[in-house]
Amino acid sequence: WFTPKILGGLVKEIKKTGMAVTLSCGEMPKEAYAYLRECGADRYLLKHETADPEIYSALHPDSSLQQRIACLKVLKRLGYETGSGFMIGLPGQTAETLADDLLLLQEIGCDMAGMGPFIPHPDTPLRELSSGSTETTKRVVALARILLPKLNLPATTSLGVLSGSEKNDVFSCGANVVMRKVTPTKYKRYYEIYPAKLGETHVIEDRKLLEQQITALERVPR
């Protein structure tokens, strides 16, 4: 339903406020990416999920890793701040796979990357699997910071779901971006990607809590 033309109109309206616009609309033709960029989109997030072609095909039987990488390279050439990322703890994943994930980020020239532990959802075919390791996740984030010192590395939502009060530890490992959900409460149930409590959304209060969290980490909110 959200065609490039409709998305472009939304981007133009949002840009009138002076805010930067980040899109995450999946794989699209080059022409669509170019049009949205012309409309003012600044960034695009398209996670590659895994650099292992066999694991990727098992998770995305109707797509291919090669196509996903091609889209990321197009986004980079069009001048988007390009974000990707991958899950940690997927079935069949190895240390070598994770190393390939990091090298792929370097090859593409990503500006941002989200790295979070895999969390099985009870309504999916992977529901019987175990979650990814939070410790491995933090180590991979640390390696990413060493390999790509200018990369923006968010503390992912999935890591917060699994690690609870320890979620801020990842900032000592190299993460430098905080993301806060502001989805209106009535819409949250339509985007339950993790089996966690949805909670209420209170934007003003949440902003204050976020600023307190950042200050407690001896960072400056901006």
Please tell me what each predicted stretch does.
Residues 8-16, 37, 72-77, 141-148, ...:
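Surface-exposed amphipathic alpha-helices with a cationic face
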Residues 29-38, 91-106, 160-173:
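Catalytic cores of alpha/beta
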Residues 6-10, 32, 67-72, 97-105, ...:
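A general structural detector for well-ordered alpha-helical segments in enzyme core domains, enriched
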